[in-house]
């Protein structure tokens, strides 16, 4: 089997387009392995961060589908489980509330499975926390509408979200997005001092991307409410 040294080097050097093209060529030539597919999923994730709108949506779906194929080939692969859950979550995040709830149970199962394989992965902890945060913030009307369409509406609380956001923080204390959502949980619980602490940490961190810059702006806005 051909190694992934070249594609991994392209990933490390952030040559994501070239790396994905190389792996697609290998797939077209008949290679179909879990290790190939989760790497394709990972490249799609990185490329999606440079896109917006419909282009980003299509890239997320493409990556999610590679991940699902990888999981079918090897359900015990942590990296396949991790990247599939991440991409599945990003796709679900773009759906309207009803569809988001419908796919939420499947996403939660994916996250739980991946975290069983590695309970310390901060990206997965953050994503599961985001799921809990979203469910906890559904309005009564949204829950009622969902219960009429689906057999079971997922249950989660702000405290559930806070546990996972804190666990992610313990693994990566300088993640602006996680600090933002930690502060939102504390604000929801009327814990303004803890929220201020997280927000003040976030606004002095360097923004590594345009998304980070937006999160910093939101953190500064939330500070006004503390």
Curated annotation (Swiss-Prot):
GO terms for molecular function: kinase binding; microtubule binding. Its main location: cytoplasm. Keywords: Cell cycle, Cell division, Chromosome partition, Cytoplasm, Cytoskeleton, Microtubule, Mitosis. Pfam families: RMD1-3. One of its GO terms (biological process) is mitotic spindle organization. Disruption phenotype: Defects in cytokinesis, spindle orientation, chromosome segregation, osmotic regulation and merotelic attachments of microtubules to chromosomes. GO terms for cellular component: cytoplasm; mitochondrion; mitotic spindle pole; spindle microtubule. InterPro entries: RMD1-3_a_helical_rpt, TPR-like_helical_dom_sf. It is found in: Cytoplasm, Cytoskeleton, Spindle pole. Belongs to the FAM82/RMD family. Interacts with air-2. Acts in chromosome segregation and organization during mitosis. This is Regulator of microtubule dynamics protein 1. It comes from Caenorhabditis elegans.
């Amino acid at each position: 089997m051909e190694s992934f040294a070249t594609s991994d080097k392209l990933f490390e050097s952030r040559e994501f387009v070239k790396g994905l093209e190389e792996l697609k060529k290998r797939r077209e030539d008949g290679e179909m392995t879990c290790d190939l597919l989760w790497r394709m999923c990972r490249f799609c994730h990185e490329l999606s961060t440079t896109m917006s709108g419909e282009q980003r949506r299509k890239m997320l779906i493409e990556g999610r589908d590679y991940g699902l194929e990888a999981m079918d080939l090897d359900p015990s692969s942590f990296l396949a489980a991790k990247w599939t859950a991440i991409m599945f979550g990003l796709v679900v995040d773009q759906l309207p509330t009803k569809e988001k709830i419908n796919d939420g149970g499947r996403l939660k199962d994916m996250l739980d499975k991946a975290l069983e394989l590695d309970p310390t992965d901060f990206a997965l902890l953050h994503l599961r926390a985001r799921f809990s945060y979203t469910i906890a913030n559904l309005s009564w009307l949204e829950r009622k509408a969902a219960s009429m369409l689906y057999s079971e509406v997922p249950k989660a609380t702000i405290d559930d979200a806070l546990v996972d956001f804190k666990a992610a923080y313990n693994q990566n204390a300088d993640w602006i997005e996680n600090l933002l959502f930690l502060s939102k949980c504390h604000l929801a619980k009327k814990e303004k001092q803890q929220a201020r602490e997280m927000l003040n940490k976030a606004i002095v961190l360097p923004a590594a991307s345009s998304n980070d810059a937006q999160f910093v702006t939101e953190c500064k806005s939330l500070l006004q409410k503390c």
